Amino acid sequence: MPIRNTLIVGDFAEVNGGQAKVAIDSARLLADAGIQVSFFAASGPVSTLLEHPNIRTICLDQKTLADNPSRLNAMTTGLWNFDALNALREEMRRHDPATTVLHCHGWAKALSPSVGRALTDGRLPVLYTMHEYFLACPNGGFYDYRANEICTRKPLSATCLTTNCDARHVNHKVWRVARSAIARGPGRIPRHLRDIAYISETQLRAMRPYLADDVNLHALPNPVATGGAKIASTRNDTFVFVGRLSPEKGGLLFAKAAKMAGFPALFVGDGPEAQSIREAYPEAEITGWVTPEEVQKCLEKARALVFPSQWYECQPLVPIEALLRGVPVVCGRWTAASEVVKHGVNGVLHDTRDVETLADSLRKVLSIGDFDTSDLERQVSPENHLSRLLSIYEEMLQRRR
């Protein structure tokens, strides 16, 4: 029998970040295609986007790790959320395994590793989309926030356990190590997950050693809609950065490079490095956080989008949005953003993380004019995402027949 129902599982029932946005957007796409969608989330509120005749929402109204007023409760439920596991099992029993696929979009902010027990018990075919690196890395990023560098230590190895890489406090690292150990043990993830979707080749390379040898891997890039009309970027002179102003995002490096190269710089975002950026380049403009619509307006001023992130990323949204609108991108070859950048065609790639190299890349991008975006548009279109989703679901159901 063909796919009829999808049970989508995630931490949030509202769009509060990229992971939740993809889960909710995919629910809408599936519902519009006639699939009956059950949307299961730990935390509310429930987005109005889930108001659809083919979508049924189950929200547990639980606190997330970040907004739980009881730190003790946050710590314990973050390690093992009994209520979420029991509720998910109850919901799974409502569905016919011959016509239903469960699609999980994460657990790290509220659901906890406990849901791994339900995901791996064989009751329903399960697809797990990796939106970060928590299936392997305790801090979810393969990044040492203290040394400000990509981490190549084996997760939960002796060198991992004895390194304080957490952005906040060593106690957070200890807790996250415990959670990772629980996920691998009683949570049975990731080794017992049979179908895993990855959103970039960069992510897959980092994660592959920690997944089961016989896992079924599925390429499933996130859908990205074009944010507006094409931009005549060659008429602009401002280099634009969009995102959190924190060390791993490389904003301060960009500020120094833009000043060295003598180019105007616009920072769209905020964060702990804002003051350091102002001191490094007083003439640069920092907007603070703005709406998605205002981000698109800022891109209309861009000669290029600069994406100086210092870590792998997974499938960063803003570089794709910029390219879709005709704005070239400058980034490092180590980030997932590099997968959509063709050096010298629609952007500039570099191999080293220093001010001089980035400044040189800013100069080089001035030689880039108009470029074709049609291939990228097809690759990340919502229509292609839906087609790929349905194909994966059908393949999974076929294996169970």
Question: Which sequence ranges carry the predicted segments?
Answer:
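N-terminal strand-loop element at the rim of the active site
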Residues: N16, A33-F82, E91, G271
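A conserved mid-protein helix/loop that constitutes part of the nucleotide-sugar donor-binding site
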Residues: K21, V240-M260, P272-Q275
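Membrane-proximal helix-turn-helix segments that form the acceptor-binding/catalytic region
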Residues: D121, F134, I150-I196
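Nucleotide-activated donor-binding/catalytic signature segment of Leloir-type glycosyltransferases, i.e.
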Residues: Q275-E294
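Conserved acidic donor-binding segment of nucleotide-sugar-dependent glycosyltransferases
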Residues: G288, H343-G344, V348-V355, R363-I368
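Short acidic/histidine- and often glycine-rich active-site loop of Leloir-type glycosyltransferases
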Residues: P319, W334-G344, V348-L349
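Short hydrophobic beta-strand element within catalytic cores of glycosyltransferases
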Residues: P328-C331
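A charged, aromatic-enriched C-terminal amphipathic alpha-helix characteristic of glycosyltransferases
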Residues: G369-R400
